[in-house]
Design a protein with these regions (language model features):
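Intrinsically disordered, low-complexity repeat and linker tracts
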Residues: 1, 13, 22-33, 199-218, ...
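Gram-positive cell-envelope targeting signals
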Residues: 1-25, 46, 59, 142, ...
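Acidic Gly/Asp/Thr-rich repetitive segments characteristic of extracellular carbohydrate-active
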Residues: 30-58, 64, 211-245
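N-terminal extracellular ligand-recognition/capping segment immediately after the signal peptide
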Residues: 40-41, 56-75, 80-88, 240-260, ...
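Charge-rich, solvent-exposed alpha-helical interaction surfaces
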Residues: 42, 46, 181, 204, ...
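Generic short beta-strand segments
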Residues: 60-63, 107, 245-248, 298-300, ...
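Surface-exposed loop/turn motifs in large extracellular/passenger domains
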Residues: 72-76, 93-107, 119-131, 144-159, ...
Length: 456
C-alpha cells in the first residue's frame, strides 16, 4: 500500500513539472490564431509574412499610418469593405500605400498629408484596385508611375487636388509609358498625364464610352465626355485645347471664358432643354474670351435656344467648319466682337422669321462695333438671309465695315441703310426665258407600211 501511494505521488509530481499540451481530437495540425491586423506594425508584419507564398491580408480595424506601407507583388490587401488607412498628422511620405500588389474594399485617405493616396510604380507592376476609395491627395488619389499598369474596378475618388488619377513618367524614367484600364469614366474620375511627348500613356475604358480630352497647363487630361466636364474644361484656367470624343447633350448654356480651341471632331452639341429664358445666356454656346476657336463642330440649338453660337465682346475668335442649326433667331450672333468664319453652314435657323445665318450687333454694355470676316464656303438654306446687321445697334454708315468678305463664295452688297444683299458667286443662274430649251413637239405616230405591216 505504501509503495502504491509513493508511485501515485511521483506520477502527480511529474504531471505538474512536465505538463504535456492537450489537443482536442482531430486538432493535430492546429496553429495559433493570427494576431489581428489593427496597427501599422501588425499590418507590416502580416504583409511581410504573406509575401513568400502570396495571399490576402485583411484589416481588422482602421489604422493611422506614420509612414508609407508597401503591398508586395503577390499579396492583396483587403479592407473588409469597412476599414480605412489614414495618413497621420505627422505623416512622412509622398504616398500612403505603394501598391505592387492588389488592393480591394479599402479606403486610403491621404488626409492632405501626402501627395497621393496610392502609388503604383515600375514596369513590372501590374496591379488591380477593386472597390478602393482614394481621397484627399494633395495632387491626385492615384499615381501610376514609371511604366506601371493599373486596372480600376469600382473605384471612387474624392477631395484630391488636381485629378483623380495621374499618369507619370517619374524621375529619370525613359522606358514604357504607364497604362491605365478603368471600367468607366465618370464626372468624378479625371485622368491627368504628366509624361514626356515620347511616352504617351495608354488609357482603356472598358465600357466603351467616349472620352473627352484636353490640354491644361501643358498636360493632357482625359475625362468623361459629358456636359459637366466640357463646361469645366472650357472654364479652367490654363486650358488650351479640348477635343470631343462623341456627341454631347446640353441642358444648360455652355459658356467659354478661357482662350481654348474646341475641336468637335465632327460631333454635335445639342440643346435638350429650353434655355431661352436664361438671362444673358439663352444661347447654346456663348464665347466670352479672346482667342477662342471652335472647329469641326455642329451646334444644334434644337429650337431650345435663341442662337446656336453667341460671341460676346471677344476678339480674334475663329469659327472653322462650324454648323449652326435650329436657332430660334439666327445661327450665330456677334455682339461687339471680331470673328473669322471659315467654311460655315447654317440650317433651319429663324423659323419663319426673316433670319437665318449671322447677326451683327452690339448687345448690352458693349461699345465696340462687331466685325465678321468670311473665308471659304458659306452654305445656307436661306442664303438671302445669311447676313443681317442690326442697324438699331450698329449705325448704317458702319454696317459695311462690319463685314469683310475675304475669300468666301459670296458676293455681298451693303446698302446705305445697312441692309445686306448676298449672292453665291458660284451658283448657276436660271437661264433667261429665250435661252431655255423649248419643249420639242410630240412626233406623229408612225404609220405601218401597207405592204409589210411594219411601222417605220
Amino acid at each position: 500500500m505504501k509503495k502504491t501511494f509513493v508511485l501515485l505521488l511521483a506520477l502527480c509530481m511529474a504531471a505538474v513539472f512536465f505538463a504535456v499540451p492537450v489537443f482536442a481530437e482531430g486538432d493535430g495540425n492546429a496553429q495559433p490564431a493570427a494576431a489581428p491586423v489593427n496597427t501599422q506594425e501588425a499590418l507590416e508584419q502580416a504583409l511581410a509574412a504573406a509575401a513568400p507564398a502570396g495571399g490576402t491580408v485583411t484589416l481588422a480595424a482602421d489604422i493611422t499610418l506614420k509612414t508609407p506601407i508597401t503591398v508586395p507583388a503577390n499579396v492583396t490587401l483587403d479592407g473588409a469593405r469597412t476599414y480605412t488607412l489614414t495618413a497621420d498628422t505627422d505623416f512622412n511620405g509622398s504616398y500612403v500605400v505603394l501598391a505592387t500588389g492588389n488592393l480591394s474594399n479599402v479606403t486610403v485617405n491621404a488626409a492632405g498629408k501626402a501627395n497621393y493616396a496610392v502609388q503604383v510604380y515600375g514596369e513590372t507592376a501590374n496591379v488591380t484596385l477593386t472597390n478602393v476609395v482614394m481621397q484627399n491627395g494633395n495632387y491626385s488619389g492615384l499615381v501610376v508611375n514609371n511604366g506601371a499598369s493599373a486596372s480600376l474596378k469600382g473605384c471612387t475618388f474624392a477631395g484630391n487636388g488636381f485629378s483623380a488619377v495621374e499618369l507619370a513618367d517619374g524621375k529619370d524614367h525613359s522606358g514604357a509609358a504607364p497604362k491605365l484600364t478603368v471600367d468607366s469614366l465618370t464626372d468624378e474620375v479625371t485622368v491627368r498625364a504628366d509624361v514626356s511627348a515620347n511616352a504617351q500613356p495608354v488609357l482603356t475604358v472598358e465600357n466603351g464610352n467616349p472620352v473627352l480630352t484636353g490640354k491644361v497647363n501643358g498636360q493632357t487630361v482625359y475625362a468623361n465626355n459629358s456636359e459637366a466636364m466640357l463646361a469645366a474644361l472650357c472654364n479652367t484656367q490654363g486650358a488650351t485645347e479640348i477635343a470631343l470624343g462623341g456627341n454631347i447633350n446640353l441642358e444648360n448654356p455652355l459658356k467659354i471664358t478661357q482662350p481654348v480651341a474646341v475641336n468637335g471632331n465632327g460631333h454635335e452639341l445639342t440643346v435638350t432643354k429650353d434655355i431661352t429664358g436664361v438671362s444673358g445666356y439663352g444661347n447654346a454656346v456663348t464665347v466670352e474670351a479672346d482667342g477662342v476657336k471652335l472647329s469641326n463642330l455642329t451646334v444644334n440649338a434644337n429650337n431650345n435656344a435663341k442662337y446656336a453660337v453667341h460671341v460676346y465682346g471677344a476678339q480674334n475668335v475663329t469659327l472653322d467648319k462650324v454648323t449652326a442649326v435650329n436657332g430660334n433667331y439666327n445661327g450665330v450672333l456677334v455682339n461687339g466682337a471680331t470673328v473669322t468664319m471659315k467654311d460655315m453652314t447654317f440650317r433651319n435657323n429663324g423659323g419663319s422669321k426673316e433670319m437665318g445665318g449671322i447677326e451683327l450687333g452690339k448687345g448690352t454694355n458693349v461699345q465696340n462695333t462687331p466685325k465678321v470676316t468670311l473665308e471659304g464656303t458659306v452654305n445656307s438654306d436661306k442664303l438671302d438671309k445669311v447676313l443681317y446687321v442690326d442697324t438699331q445697334q450698329v449705325d448704317a454708315a458702319n454696317a459695311a465695315g462690319a463685314i469683310e468678305n475675304k475669300t468666301s463664295n459670296l458676293n455681298i452688297t451693303v446698302g446705305a441703310d445697312g441692309s445686306v444683299t448676298v449672292v453665291d458667286k458660284n451658283a448657276k443662274p436660271d437661264p433667261k426665258p429665250e435661252e431655255k430649251p423649248s419643249t420639242p413637239a410630240p412626233s406623229a405616230p408612225a404609220k405601218a407600211n401597207p405592204k409589210t405591216g411594219v411601222k417605220a
